[in-house]
Amino acid sequence: FLKTTALPAMRELGEELSDKYSLSVNIQTHFDREEPAVEFTIHKESLRDFMYGIKTIKREVSEQLIKDGHLPHIRHNVTYEPYTYFFDGRSGYDVQYMDRRELIADILKQYERYLNLLTDVGQELMSHQQTELAE
C-alpha cells in the first residue's frame, strides 16, 4: 500500500502544490523501520510544518478467523494495516481502503484543518494583544 498507493498519491499532490502554488513540499520514505512509513511535509516559514504520515501497524489475527472456512483469504496470524499520523500528535486512522484520489483528498482535508488551526491561533493572539493594548 505504501509503495503502490500512498507514495504515488503524495508525489502527485506534491508536484501540483509545488508547481501551481510554490509550496515547499518534501516526501520522505522510511521503509527500513520496524513500522515502515511515508511522510508528506509542507514547510512553513517560522511556523510548525504540516506533516501527514502513513505507517504500517502490525496486528494479530484471531486463530478463529484463520480457521474459518468462510474466510479462505485469511491465512496468516499477523496482518499489516496502514494508519495515518500527524504533525500535532493526533491519533490516526486506517486508510487501507482508500485509493490514490481519496488519499489526496484526505491529505488536502488535513492540510485545510492545519491552516484553519493556524488562522484560529493567529486570531486568538491578535485579540489577546489588542486587549493588552486597550488596558
For every predicted segment, state its role.
Residues 35-135:
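Intrinsic disorder/low-complexity polar-acidic segments
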Residues 1-24:
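Contiguous, amphipathic alpha-helical segments that mediate oligomerization or scaffolding
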Residues 10, 25, 88, 92:
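Sparse, context-dependent recognition of short Cys/His-centered cofactor- or disulfide-binding micro-motifs
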Residues 27-30:
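Charge-dense, helix-prone N-terminal extensions
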